[in-house]
Structures are given as structure tokens and as C-alpha cells.
Amino acid sequence: MNATHRGAQADASAPAGGLPPATAAERVQWLRDELDRHNYQYYVLDAPTIPDAEYDALFTELQALEAEHPELLTPDSPTQRVGGAPLSAFDTVRHRVPMLSLNNGFSDEDVTGFDRRCAQGLGRSAAAGGEQDLFSAAEGVEYACELKFDGLAMSLRYEDGRLVQAATRGDGETGEDVTVNVRTIKAIPLKLRGAAPAVLEVRGEVFMYRRDFDKLNARQAEAGDKTFVNPRNAAAGSLRQLDPRITAKRPLSFFAYGLGELQGIERPATHSAMLDGFATMGLPVCNERAVVKGAQGLLDFYRKVGEKRDQLPYDIDGVVYKVNALAEQEQLGFVSRAPRFALAHKFPAQEMTTIVEDIEVQVGRTGAITPVARLQPVFVGGVTVTNATLHNEDEVRRKDVHIGDTVIVRRAGDVIPEVVAVVLERRPDDARAFVMPTACPVCGSHIERLEDEAIARCTGGLICAAQRKQALLHFAQRRAMDIEGLGDKVVEQLVDQGIVRTPADLYKLGVAKLAALDRMADKSAGNLVAAIEASRSTTFNRFIFSLGIRHVGEATAKDLARHFGKLDGLMVADEAALLEVNDVGPVVAQSIVNFFGEPHNVEVIEQLRAAGVHWPESEPVARAPAPLAGKTFVLTGTLPSLSREAAKEMLEAAGAKVAGSVSKKTDYVVAGAEAGSKLDKAEALGVPVLDEAGMLALLESVGAGQPGEQS
């Protein structure tokens, strides 16, 4: 394990001081080249060429020379990976090329369907030729196959070969600037090897090898610090440290797998050639990859990787398939926010058995009531699980989960633990069935479950502590009461400090109380008080919308305001009266009745009126004609020129109800390309089927307008 440069050990031990600048400059450059080479051998090729002590000697000498000759220090020097002063926060970065997520596949059928769609999109005859052609290696689409790493997605921007920016994926459009932290990761080159393009954005994954994770946790435990539950959390937590000196001490690694912006050179012809090019530039690229043809090639790669998944030195949660030719990727394009040319094939989640000690309900920020199984602790999917979601009451009944049961627990998608099934032969005699409560465990309000909905909800939206923050943010938003300055941070403090419990409490706030909040100066507090004061005068439809009644959006709020004219009439309306309102069906009517039937909500509304919240009232108006009232439509597939949302708006504007599933009560199904099972069911039930042109003709025949004309 000797350095390949002749005389390396002798040079490494030579004193640093006393060298003339010209000689120092040459020595500094040689040391940097040597350290970069050894970093590449160690972190990329996993083939170290010198002992750690010799590497440390080279590094120490370079540090000393740069201290003696500060004019020679450059940002891409290996010594600059140690981290600088702590940050107060991360800046936001807008990705020039969005970092899109991938569609997931979980079965062989998902993979063959993906291959079929790619072949069809590329005009391959094999796609239409049936099963035999689909699996033909000669005719099949060529794919690049690689691992799906369980880490943190990252974008590295190099300009003229030098790392200038690193950003997290974020929401795909914008991420966080973590450049100072990423510069401490030795696996990531600060300067690319060889000729480099003017701009190169490399997409990849920051992760932690299992061996490094174990060592880190051992050090954390020895120091009495918090340990991490899995390598992914350790990697994400390490990378998002505001103090880069902490990141520098964490054993983070990186694999490159994608391309963002590129300037100065032509794009490679294939994805596999791109990865080879990354490796040539000194970027770490995983060698567990292959180029295959057709669906069978994809499935073979998936099974081979699955067989050795546990033996890999890092965590993965699946494999990724991408059409290999970049020109074909462009031809296939994107659907929604995911590429058509790629698929993430997830591994089955790991499963274990444990005992249900209790079943409780949790109240979400929108009032959703979710049964949660309290479990005997069990280690599954890399973490210790003590709770698992049961989703809703129907799922509890369908799975027949009792308190005391032995159940199979799975980490769905390796993230959210869920109860998969009950081991009935182990059910004890004293097992107890779950009973859904009728009152909210947080605020005591009535729990409702609307027709055709699986989720039960707390009706105390204006009073419930679990929904408090969300209710206040909704109340204050621009389209509701328009209270500028009442954002997430302010609401969080107001609620957490017990200052505000309901929207009515907002109108009791003064400048002094608000100015005492974190990051709220007197001027900001004054502006917020003025905005709250201005909101006392509003419109009826804005007030209705601000209440956050389930299923009552802006358009429905306008219809209710026009129809009733006065709040008192709306509050006492029964379902029959509400069904007279344009675009209000049984589900919406029931939701409104339940909301105003909850005394807690009425109490808050009266407090708001007492606080001076007011609006012009008017006399009720006659209901506008709805030519398709009473008709139920179902939309399926992709329409040629209309989005599904636009088609839904047009139908609802004409008075129709748009449902999500086909039944005997369905009047029409509007079908586009790739309609699927809904079309099959419609044909089996004899439900009339329209295409887009037929739907538009029907709307025209009844005199219905375009979407938005009735808003």
C-alpha cells in the first residue's frame, strides 16, 4: 500500500517551512493532486493505496503550507472540507432543471405495464404484439437498471469543473442550499478530473454505509448523544446541520445517477454512457447496474438485486429502470410530475408479528379520525415500531383487528408502519373488538362520517385543538378573511403559547401581545393588528369559506351566499333546503348541517359577530337553472384536449354530480385513452359511455357554458 508517486513517503515527511513561494506553489499543487488521487482511490474505487498515517502526513503538510502561504489557498483544496462557521438557516435554491419524483411499481404486472407503455410510446411493434413480443430481447426497449438508494437526493452544480453549489431536492422545484456541508463530504470531488463542461449539474444520493452508520452510533452512544434509527435518518440529519463542522465529522457518501443542466458539451447518447462519463470525471457511481432489454430483463435485474439486498453495504428500497437512450427519454416525455421513461420498482416492505396492546384514535389537523394500533415494540424495516395505522373504521372491520390480537406489521413503503393482517389462530379469549368513539377525544365535538366517505371527522373545526392551527391559517388566508401577516410561524406561536384558541380570539389581539412574539417587531405587529381590524368588514361568501366547512370551497360558498343572503338562514337550513342551492348535493348538504349542528362552532360564530365581523346581507335569490341536475357522471382515462379537472368543472357547472366510481346509479361515463376498469364496469352495467366530443355535445345541447362562466 505504497504511494505510486516516487518518493512520496520521503516528501511527505519533509518539513514544510522555509520553502520559497515558487517551490511552495509547486509543492502545494502536488500535494493537492496526491490527496485528490487518494480520495478517489478510497471513496470512489474503494481501493486505498496508502495507509491512513501517510495520508494524514500529506494532509498536515498541505495545511501547514497553506497557512504559511495564504495566497495559495483555493476553495477546491482538500483542506477546505473541514467546515466553516455555523449557519443561521439554509438559503433556498430554485432548480434550473426540476428534480422530479418517479412513479412506483410494486409487482411484475406494474413492470410489464411500464415496458408496454414505453414500447407503445416509442412506436415499437413489439408493444402491440402480445406477450411473446413484449419479452423478446431482439425487439424490446433498452433500459438502464440501477439501485434505488435510501438516502437524500442531491443536486451538485459544477462550473468549469469546480463545485459551486449543492442543493437538496426539496419539493422538486426548489431545495435548500447545503453547499458548505456537501463540501465536507470526501466522496464528492470539489474539482472534476480531466476536461470538464462549462456547466454540469449532477443528480445523486447522499447516504451512509451501514458500517459507517454503526460506528457513528457507537460514538454517539459513548458520548451520551442521541443515536440515529437508521442510515437514512443519519445521512439526512448530518447533511442538514447548520454547523458544517458537525457534518464534516459524519461519514457521508455519495452516488451519482442523473443529469440536470449541461452546457459546453453534447449530452451523451445513453444513460449508461452518462454514468460512465461521471466515473471518468471522478464522481462516485455505483457498479451495481446493468443495461437490459424488455420486461424480462428488468425483472431479472430486480430479482438478482433482491437476492443480495441484505449483503449490500448500504440500504436500498428498490431498483430504478430508465429508458437508456436519452433521445427516447425525450420522446416519451413526462406525465404530471414524473417521467414516463422511468419507474422505481420497490421491494416488498419487511414484515414482523407483534401484539396489539390497544387501539386509540388520533385527530389530524383537518379533523380526520384515524384508528392507531398501539403495539408491543417490534423491530421491522430498520426501526423499532410501537404504533401502526389502521387507516379507518372500515379497515379495522375488514381486517378484523381486535385488542389483544397478534398481527403482522409492515412498514408500508418502508416508511409508515401498518397492520397487514391478523393471525387469527393466536387470538386470545379476552380479545376485545374496537368501538369507534362518537365524540372527538380532543374537544368532545360530535364525530361525523359522511355518506360514501371512509374517513370519520371531528365536526368541531373552529374549537378543536388538534385542528386549531390549520383552522386559523384557513380563516386568515387571502381568499377567506385576508389577514395579511398571519402566517405559519405566527399562528404556531399564538397557539403553542395559548394566546389564541379560536378565530374569534384574533380580534382581541393588540400590538403589545404580538410584538412579544419571536421575530415580531412593533411595526410588523402593528401591520398585523391593522390587517385583523380590516378583516372585520368582509363579504358573506368569504366568511362562509373562512369557516372551513368540509366540501365547501370558494364556488360553493358563493352559491350559498347568493341563495341564502343571510347567515341566520344558512345556519338553520336543513338538508332539503340546502339541496335547493345550485351545485350542492347530499354530501355537501350533510356536511353543512353537521357543521352548524355542532354547538361549539355556533358559539365561535357568535363570538365573531360580537367582535364586529360583518358583511352586507341581501335577500335570497332564486336557484339558477341546472340542466344536468340529478345526473351522475364518472370520468376515466385521459381526454384529448381537456384535463379531468376542467371536464369536472363543466359538468358540475351544469348541475351534474361527478363521482369517483361506476355503479348502477351512474348516468354517463366519459372515457378517454387508457380508461381501464371503470370503462369495463360501465359496459357490463350498460351505462352509456361518451367520449370528450360526446360530452361537449351533450353540454351544448342543454345550453351549459364553459368552465368558470358561473363563478
UniProtKB/Swiss-Prot annotation:
Domain BRCT: 623-711
Region span, Disordered: 1-21
A Gene Ontology cellular-component term: cytosol
Cofactor(s) annotated in UniProt: Mg(2+); Mn(2+)
Keyword Magnesium: yes
Enzyme class at the top of the EC tree: ligase
Name of one Pfam family that matches: DNA_ligase_ZBD
Binding, Zn(2+): 440, 443, 458, 464
Keywords: DNA damage, DNA repair, DNA replication, Ligase, Magnesium, Manganese, Metal-binding, NAD, Zinc
Keyword Cytoplasm attributed: no
Binding site for NAD(+): 52-56, 101-102, 146, 169, 205, 322, 346
InterPro entries attached to this UniProt entry: BRCT_dom (IPR001357), BRCT_dom_sf (IPR036420), DisA/LigA_HHH (IPR041663), DNA_ligase (IPR001679), DNA_ligase_AS (IPR018239), DNA_ligase_CS (IPR033136), DNAligase_adenylation (IPR013839), DNAligase_N (IPR013840)
GO MF, one annotated term: metal ion binding
Residues spanning the signal sequence: none
Record's compositionally biased regions (Low complexity): 10-21
SMART domains per UniProt: BRCT (SM00292), HhH1 (SM00278), LIGANc (SM00532)
Catalysed reactions, as listed in the record: NAD(+) + (deoxyribonucleotide)n-3'-hydroxyl + 5'-phospho-(deoxyribonucleotide)m = (deoxyribonucleotide)n+m + AMP + beta-nicotinamide D-nucleotide
Described purpose of this protein according to its UniProt entry: DNA ligase that catalyzes the formation of phosphodiester linkages between 5'-phosphoryl and 3'-hydroxyl groups in double-stranded DNA using NAD as a coenzyme and as the energy source for the reaction. It is essential for DNA replication and repair of damaged DNA.
HAMAP family with a match to the protein in the record: DNA_ligase_A (MF_01588)
Sequence similarity: Belongs to the NAD-dependent DNA ligase family. LigA subfamily.
Name assigned to this protein: DNA ligase
Organism: Cupriavidus pinatubonensis (strain JMP 134 / LMG 1197) (Cupriavidus necator (strain JMP 134))
